[in-house]
């Protein structure tokens, strides 16, 4: 396993839609393992393949187990997992605002409004289709990582003024990281 370099915004790869994974082979399995190692090394909750320069529809996450009262049956959080070719099939009308950060936009966090619940289908490493219902941080992180796969940075959900300020700061931070 290897720690991969994380792509820092602004970078064209981060605003490019990732392509479907058509063959889940040993190279893809190795990439998933490397992404987990990279995410843990960077102390992140999630990491999309585009964030390590691979324009494929894959992300990894580790949302620690938590108990959420008053959540519908079948929803909740999970630990370490990954998704290949994820697709959200259902989003709740109910939305929540929470602060998010991103390994590709270091030293920033912003309040973002997102749907509270979702259902997502995806492929596992055995090429089997899976379905997951999610709420809380799990749902939020799935939406954040799926945005990456669609070429959308989380700061795009901000007003134009806040987005422009966030990108200006990102440019300064990137210069610091490149030194």
From Swiss-Prot:
Pfam families: Pep_deformylase (PF01327). InterPro entries: Peptide_deformylase, Peptide_deformylase_sf. Fe cation binds at residues 102, 144, 148. The active site is at 145. Keywords: Hydrolase, Iron, Metal-binding, Protein biosynthesis. GO terms for biological process: translation. Its EC number is 3.5.1.88. Binds 1 Fe(2+) ion. Its cofactor is Fe(2+). Gene3D superfamilies: Peptide deformylase. Transmembrane segments: none annotated. GO terms for molecular function: metal ion binding; peptide deformylase activity. It catalyses: N-terminal N-formyl-L-methionyl-[peptide] + H2O = N-terminal L-methionyl-[peptide] + formate. Removes the formyl group from the N-terminal Met of newly synthesized proteins. Requires at least a dipeptide for an efficient rate of reaction. N-terminal L-methionine is a prerequisite for activity but the enzyme has broad specificity at other positions. Belongs to the polypeptide deformylase family. This is Peptide deformylase. It comes from Wolbachia pipientis wMel. The lineage of its organism: Bacteria, Pseudomonadati, Pseudomonadota, Alphaproteobacteria, Rickettsiales. The gene is def.
